[in-house]
Amino acid sequence: MAVFKLRVLTPEKIFFEGDAEQLIAKTTSGYVGILKGHAPYVASIVPSEMKIRSDGSFRSAAISDGIVKVSEDSMVTVLTSAIEWSDEIDVARAERSKARAEKQLKAETSRTEFDLAERQLKRAVNRISVANKK
């Protein structure tokens, strides 16, 4: 299968950089599959499972909000605030984060605090879901 260059970046690190055969990500308009030669493209990624096919096999990761960009030279870049491989997710920690977010959502808080708790809940639920697909 043909390969393209893929970079997945967070503010803290380069999560993945190398050749990929396919990228599957969930955007605001649904799932997108990217192969070599994909047309230039930009989309917002929602918290979900992202799959990278490299060396003939898929590897899954839990990704937070982000952006995927396919440039004219077929370079694919994913920018996200947080991402982790499914086999590296600390499920107990994610469960604690979920419980904290649910508690915060039930409390009387400002709209900003509510929105933050809602995002934290979505991220925790996504991490748990992706980890349990191993």
From Swiss-Prot:
<comment type="similarity">
    <text>Belongs to the ATPase epsilon chain family.</text>
</comment>
<keyword id="KW-0406">Ion transport</keyword>
<dbReference type="InterPro" id="IPR036771">
    <property type="entry name" value="ATPsynth_dsu/esu_N"/>
</dbReference>
<keyword id="KW-0139">CF(1)</keyword>
<keyword id="KW-0375">Hydrogen ion transport</keyword>
<comment type="subunit">
    <text>F-type ATPases have 2 components, CF(1) - the catalytic core - and CF(0) - the membrane proton channel. CF(1) has five subunits: alpha(3), beta(3), gamma(1), delta(1), epsilon(1). CF(0) has three main subunits: a, b and c.</text>
</comment>
<protein>
    <recommendedName>
        <fullName>ATP synthase epsilon chain</fullName>
    </recommendedName>
</protein>
<keyword id="KW-0066">ATP synthesis</keyword>
<dbReference type="InterPro" id="IPR020547">
    <property type="entry name" value="ATP_synth_F1_esu_C"/>
</dbReference>
<dbReference type="GO" id="GO:0046933">
    <property type="term" value="F:proton-transporting ATP synthase activity, rotational mechanism"/>
</dbReference>
<dbReference type="Pfam" id="PF00401">
    <property type="entry name" value="ATP-synt_DE"/>
</dbReference>
<dbReference type="InterPro" id="IPR001469">
    <property type="entry name" value="ATP_synth_F1_dsu/esu"/>
</dbReference>
<keyword id="KW-1003">Cell membrane</keyword>
<dbReference type="GO" id="GO:0045259">
    <property type="term" value="C:proton-transporting ATP synthase complex"/>
</dbReference>
<comment type="function">
    <text>Produces ATP from ADP in the presence of a proton gradient across the membrane.</text>
</comment>
<dbReference type="GO" id="GO:0005886">
    <property type="term" value="C:plasma membrane"/>
</dbReference>
<dbReference type="GO" id="GO:0005524">
    <property type="term" value="F:ATP binding"/>
</dbReference>
<keyword id="KW-0813">Transport</keyword>
<dbReference type="InterPro" id="IPR036794">
    <property type="entry name" value="ATP_F1_dsu/esu_C_sf"/>
</dbReference>
<dbReference type="Pfam" id="PF02823">
    <property type="entry name" value="ATP-synt_DE_N"/>
</dbReference>
<keyword id="KW-0472">Membrane</keyword>
<dbReference type="InterPro" id="IPR020546">
    <property type="entry name" value="ATP_synth_F1_dsu/esu_N"/>
</dbReference>
